[in-house]
């Protein structure tokens, strides 16, 4: 019999708990699994020995389904970066000690790029130490959709659905007046513009906007931006713009640097924000029309009420696949989504070496972006559309979606 540990890390999503549900579901149905532990607050919970017995928290299918519709990370999260073991191996030895104490054979870590870095480092350390009876497997999660190897990341489809819907609603609101006005919406995405690109989905509802989509893959010029806006204002009263939070100028500097914090997180990433605000000020100063900036911020990653059924179902199945890989001893691997067909849409799951995925960025391909660098092409629309299909049969309580708490 095997004991299994699962944890979540990084930024929450609307689908990360569906992946957790898939892990638990597979483990509960496996005759080879005895205990199922959850680490509270990711790898930090392992280091602090803050583990809970998930068999006492999830006891039936209804609770598994409820977990799938619960946003954010039900086990909590963390931003802990493991040190290079060649410099300091203390954390690794602590982790192994805790895993040994609870007789854990399989550890599944659900998270994004930095979490896959943890899976990679821990797997290599175990291998270097000749420890073969502990298997570490990664399960992808990130609304940024910037993990390599996988066609798309669990959580991205739901965030894309929310963003497309939000732009469709904003477009209708902005066009009710005849006053010249510009609305600039900042979308998450430090290193890749996938989320911002999802704003194009609003056009499927008949919306003309967003009028411009600026991704961080394209060097950004405020002068060119202002020319775009001025030209569009000559054609229509309202202009709606989507911009990635991580847009940079030709010198590689964030345009938002003048308003961003100098602080960085534990992985060395700058806390960036304010791109839309910088552009709002530029429009106000150079064009002089009515202008507002909107930052979607956390809403785009926790709007479970608008989750994509495709995303949630795939995320749950991916969790089951990751659990199976762990039980089969496929250490140092990540469960990936492989798109086998677009029309009709179909996917399968595959275990890929996490060493080829960790610390790499999947950028938006050049042929998904128009020549002017201010919009996306039909290839992007074709890529995105299947990921947002379907709606969840959400359970409500007193008029509000019902959620589950694990700790």
Labelled PLM ranges:
Residues 2-6, 67-81, 141-151, 178-181, ...:
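Gly-rich Lys/Arg/Thr-decorated short loops/hinges at beta-loop-alpha junctions or inter-strand turns
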Residues 49-105, 114, 143, 154-156, ...:
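Glycine-rich oxoanion-binding loops at beta->alpha junctions
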Residues 98, 106-111, 117-133, 153-292:
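Accessory alpha-helical/coil subdomains and C-terminal extensions
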Residues 3-13, 73-79, 105-111, 138, ...:
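Short glycine-rich or small-residue beta-strand-to-loop segments that form or flank ligand, phosphate
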Residues 9-11, 39-45, 79-80, 112-113, ...:
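Short, ordered loop/turn segments at secondary-structure junctions
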Residues 1-51:
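N-terminal phosphate-binding or glycine-rich loops at protein starts, especially the Walker A/P-loop
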């Amino acid at each position: 019999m095997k004991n299994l540990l699962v944890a979540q890390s990084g930024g929450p999503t609307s689908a990360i708990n569906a992946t957790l549900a898939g892990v638990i579901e597979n483990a509960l149905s496996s005759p080879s699994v005895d205990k199922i532990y959850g680490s509270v607050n990711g790898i930090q919970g392992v280091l602090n020995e803050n583990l809970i017995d998930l068999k006492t928290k999830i006891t039936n299918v209804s609770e598994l389904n409820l977990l799938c519709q619960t946003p954010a990370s039900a086990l909590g999260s963390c931003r802990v970066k493991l040190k290079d073991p060649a410099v300091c191996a203390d954390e690794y030895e602590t982790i192994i000690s805790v895993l040994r104490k609870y007789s854990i054979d399989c550890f599944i870590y659900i998270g994004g790029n930095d979490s896959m870095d943890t899976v990679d480092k821990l797997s290599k350390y175990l291998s270097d130490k000749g420890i073969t009876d502990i298997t570490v497997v990664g399960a992808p999660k990130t609304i940024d959709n910037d993990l390599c190897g996988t066609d798309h990341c669990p959580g991205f489809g739901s965030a894309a659905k929310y963003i497309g819907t939000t732009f469709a609603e904003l477009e209708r609101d902005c066009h009710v007046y005849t006053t010249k006005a510009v609305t600039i919406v900042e979308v998450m995405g430090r290193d890749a513009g996938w989320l911002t690109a999802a704003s194009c989905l609003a056009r499927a509802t008949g919306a003309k906007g967003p009028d411009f989509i600026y991704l961080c893959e394209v060097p950004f010029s405020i002068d060119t931006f202002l020319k775009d806006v001025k030209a569009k204002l000559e054609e229509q009263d309202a202009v709606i713009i989507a911009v990635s939070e991580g847009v940079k100028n030709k010198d590689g500097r964030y345009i938002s640097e003048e308003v961003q914090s100098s602080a960085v997180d534990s992985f060395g990433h700058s806390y960036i924000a304010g791109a839309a605000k910088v552009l709002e000020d530029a429009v106000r100063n150079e064009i002089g029309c009515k202008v507002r900036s909107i930052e979607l911020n956390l809403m785009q990653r926790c709007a479970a009420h608008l989750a994509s059924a495709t995303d949630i179902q795939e995320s749950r199945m991916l969790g089951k696949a990751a659990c199976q890989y762990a039980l089969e001893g496929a250490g140092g691997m990540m469960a990936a989504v492989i798109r086998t067909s677009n029309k009709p849409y179909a996917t399968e799951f595959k275990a890929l070496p996490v060493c080829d995925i960790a610390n790499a960025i999947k950028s938006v391909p050049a042929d998904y972006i128009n020549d002017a660098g201010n919009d996306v092409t039909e290839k992007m629309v074709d890529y995105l559309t299947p990921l947002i299909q379907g709606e969840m049969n959400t359970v409500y309580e007193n008029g509000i979606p019902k959620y589950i708490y694990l700790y």
